[in-house]
A protein has these predicted regions:
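Short, glycine/serine-rich, charged loops/turns that create anion-binding
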Residues: 13-14, 45, 133-134
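Helix-loop-strand module that forms the ligand-binding subsite of alpha/beta enzymes
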Residues: 4, 60-169, 234-238
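N-terminal beta1-alpha1 ligand-phosphate binding loop
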Residues: 4-34
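N-terminal beta-loop-helix "entrance" segment that forms/cooperates
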Residues: 40-63
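Conserved beta-strand scaffold positions in the cores of enzyme catalytic domains, especially
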Residues: 8, 38-40, 157
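Glycine-rich phosphate/pyrophosphate-binding loop and the adjoining helix
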Residues: 33, 156-242
Length: 242
């Protein structure tokens, strides 16, 4: 039985915090399936620069800035599915996540379009998870942003079992409980949020298996865009056009 690879992405600059625990709980739920293989990428401690609009990616077919983006790509590219997890910052994603998505999205387009190919149809199955210091501090906005980003990257976004009271488009957990609203394990006290994250993760695993089996069964009947792969090398140094 071919494994389904699920990548958990911890999009928090805070190491081993609530978002990391939320993503790990979600990944653990998928490990009950013998056909699932999990991996993890954490943004914490990584240097990820913002896009400066130099357009060198049009010339080189990839971003010329050698930083944590390439560590991310090493794990993202082979994954069949991804579970995005972020904390809510100012009713949105952390700036480092925005920087990652800006460059990754642009580079994906330029890598293929500048070589005369159509936009790739990766069809990665995606689930989105957020943790916030309050119940209603922008969780829905952040979930929507992540879900739309996945759609923009030709992903297949799934939700949990919303009829049971889970979040409609992902999972939102509360991590701001008193008396210590900044504790790194507060999210584990939110039983409903953890249950929602596990529900999303299970649906991601199931759908990823369906998509992978379907692509394998159809094989050459599908357009070439479904089987594109990156051919990337870490740039030696950045040469930017201001």
């Amino acid at each position: 039985m071919e494994k389904v690879r699920i990548l958990g992405i911890v999009g928090s600059p805070r190491k081993d915090g609530n978002t990391a625990k939320l993503v790990e709980e979600a990944l653990e739920a998928t490990r009950a399936f013998p056909w699932v293989e999990t991996d993890l990428f954490s943004i914490a401690g990584k240097k990820i620069n913002h896009c400066v609009g130099c357009y060198r990616c049009m010339e080189k077919h990839q971003c010329v800035v050698p930083d944590g983006l390439y560590q991310f790509l090493d794990k993202y590219i082979p994954a069949d599915a991804v579970l995005w997890g972020v904390p809510v910052f100012h009713m949105g994603v952390p700036s480092v996540v925005k920087a990652l998505l800006d460059r990754f999205g642009c580079m994906t387009l330029m890598h293929f379009l500048t070589q005369g190919k159509d936009v790739p149809r990766f069809s990665k199955v995606c689930g989105v998870l957020v943790s916030g210091a309050s119940h209603y501090g922008g969780q829905d906005l952040t979930l929507s942003y992540l879900a739309n980003s996945c759609l923009l990257m030709n992903g297949v976004v799934v939700a949990g079992d919303s009829i049971r009271g889970d979040s409609y488009i992902g999972a939102a957990a509360w991590a701001g409980q008193w008396p210590n609203p900044f504790a790194k394990d507060n999210v584990l006290k939110d039983e409903k949020g953890i249950a929602a994250a596990k529900s999303v993760a299970i649906r991601v695993a199931e759908m990823a298996r369906i998509v992978k089996a379907g692509k394998a069964a159809l094989g050459s009947e599908l357009p070439a865009e479904y089987s594109y792969t990156f051919n990337l090398e870490m740039p030696a140094k950045a040469k930017l056009i201001a």
